[in-house]
Structures are given as structure tokens and as C-alpha cells.
Amino acid sequence: MSKKSGRNIKPGELNLKEKLVHINRTAKVVKGGKRFGFNAIVVVGDKEGHVGYGLGKANEVQDAIAKGVEDGKKNVIKVPIVKGTIPHPIVAKYGSAKVLMKPATPGTGLIAGGAVRAVLEMAGIHDILTKSLGSSNPHNVVKAAIKGLQNISDANDVAERRSKSLKEVFES
């Protein structure tokens, strides 16, 4: 993702909220029985165009969630939002999870299921059509949605790549 890594975003300056997507209980068999652990996937965002995800693992649920939030704050990206939606349709794939996202007119609402809904809510997108294809594994679906949002080009990026002005981009 050399195009836009989002490394210049300082999460301390943002008012980030978190949303728990999935908790998984894991078991390790030891001599005395089973040791249980937990992992949690958490999406963080300010609902104004910044979103990130994190995975936390611990022996207690609350510790796993806290670690997930900290990890999510390290992975925050900026999403270009135009009138409450995305500028153009995009398809992203991570593993066997595939997420299709299409811009929608104002008033359509957030049409998304499960893990994708959490990512888009935290990003602050209000009108969008999505479809999750392939795997329904929440880890891979979240990563595919984030990858798609990261690959969205706004008008300024397109103009810069084409060495044209914004006006020329919209006229062509």
C-alpha cells in the first residue's frame, strides 16, 4: 500500500471511538485441562473520515479489547468522503473475503452487513451500498473493507497523477 499509507495521521489528535466487531475464545490444552484465551477485532474511528482496525489477544476479554483498541489506533487511515459517500465504486479482496462498495445518493443509508457496517460507521460514511462476497470471516472482511477504503482515489489524487488541474479532470 505505498499509494497512501496514512502514516502522517496522529491518533492522539483525533477523537476516536471504538466498536467491537468480533470476540473469539481460543483453547490451549495443557496437562491440567484447558487454558482459555480471547481475541477481539476492534474498529476505531472518529466518524469524520478516519478509521482503523486492531486485533487484541489476551487471557481476559477486556484486556483483549483494550489491546485491539491500541492496535487499531496504530493503523488509522484517512478516507475521502464526498457528500456522505465514497467518490467511486471499488472492489477489494483480502484472502477469500471480497467486499464491493458503491456510492449512493443522499438518503439511501448505510446498506452493509456485519463487519463492513462497523468499518463504514466508524469512518463516517452515511450513504453507501455494499456487498460482502466469499468468506464471511470477520477478520478478513474487515481487512478487505479497510483495503478498499485505502485504495479510494479522491479528485486531487487523480489530478496529481494525470498532471492536470481539478477542472480538467472533471471535464474529461
From Swiss-Prot:
It comes from the Bacteria. SUPFAM superfamilies: dsRNA-binding domain-like (SSF54768), Ribosomal protein S5 domain 2-like (SSF54211). NCBIfam families: rpsE_bact (TIGR01021). Keywords: Ribonucleoprotein, Ribosomal protein, RNA-binding, rRNA-binding. It comes from Chlorobaculum tepidum (strain ATCC 49652 / DSM 12025 / NBRC 103806 / TLS). With S4 and S12 plays an important role in translational accuracy. The keyword Transcription regulation does not apply. HAMAP family: Ribosomal_uS5_B. The keyword Signal does not apply. One of its GO terms (biological process) is translation. GO terms for molecular function: rRNA binding; structural constituent of ribosome. This is Small ribosomal subunit protein uS5. GO terms for cellular component: small ribosomal subunit. Part of the 30S ribosomal subunit. Contacts proteins S4 and S8. Belongs to the universal ribosomal protein uS5 family. PROSITE patterns: RIBOSOMAL_S5, S5_DSRBD. The gene is rpsE. Gene3D superfamilies: 3.30.160.20, 3.30.230.10. The N-terminal domain interacts with the head of the 30S subunit; the C-terminal domain interacts with the body and contacts protein S4. The interaction surface between S4 and S5 is involved in control of translational fidelity. Residues 16-79 form the S5 DRBM domain.
